[in-house]
């Protein structure tokens, strides 16, 4: 008799849970007001509302020795870090284009001179990252608003036209731009 009573109580609990656990259709949501109402069309009042996940990125961790060119092209988060440990001989140049006005905060375009060629980062290419040249990072290229031409000797010299990111320079063991 006690077993039947326990089985009956458990059956009632399951039925009550399924009936009482159903919502009535009027939940307590927010009113829909947020930072979407703040206009960010003018740059003197820059409002930001973000709840995105933490950015992920490129990570290389090794005790080996890497030789050769490394070119990275693409969109990166607005706030980013780079950590390089050890002895490293490096040279590079690039153009970063970012803006405010549509609510999107981030680096929208980052271009360097990568492709096939000779020298540090000089090469022949077109598309997102283009450049034609030899030497450090000098080159001639067009990369959708980020291009340049010039020559570099162990440095980052170049003459470019990149909608506000261009310059002329000659680099010998350094970086020349104006």
Curated annotation (Swiss-Prot):
Central domain: annotated segments: 47-110
Ranges for region Left arm: 22-46
Keywords: Repeat, Signal
Signal peptide span: 1-21
Region annotated Right arm (Gly-rich tandem repeats), chain positions: 111-178
Family classification: Belongs to the chorion protein family.
Functional summary from the UniProt entry: This protein is one of many from the eggshell of the silk moth.
Record's protein name: Chorion class high-cysteine HCB protein 13
């Amino acid at each position: 008799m006690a077993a039947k009573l326990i089985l009956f109580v458990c059956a009632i609990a399951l039925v009550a849970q399924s009936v009482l656990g159903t919502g009535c259709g009027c939940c307590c949501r927010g009113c829909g007001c947020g930072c979407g109402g703040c206009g960010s069309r003018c740059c003197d009042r820059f409002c930001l509302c973000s709840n995105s996940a933490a950015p992920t990125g490129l990570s290389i961790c090794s005790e080996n020795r890497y030789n050769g060119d490394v070119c990275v092209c693409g969109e990166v988060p607005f706030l980013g870090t780079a950590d390089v440990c050890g002895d490293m001989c490096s040279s590079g140049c690039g153009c970063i284009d970012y803006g405010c006005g549509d609510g999107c905060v981030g680096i929208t375009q980052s271009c360097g001179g990568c492709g096939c060629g000779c020298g540090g980062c000089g090469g022949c290419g077109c598309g997102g990252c283009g450049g034609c040249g030899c030497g450090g990072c000098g080159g001639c290229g067009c990369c959708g608003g980020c291009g340049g031409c010039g020559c570099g000797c162990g440095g980052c010299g170049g003459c470019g036209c990149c909608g506000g990111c261009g310059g002329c320079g000659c680099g010998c063991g350094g970086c020349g731009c104006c």
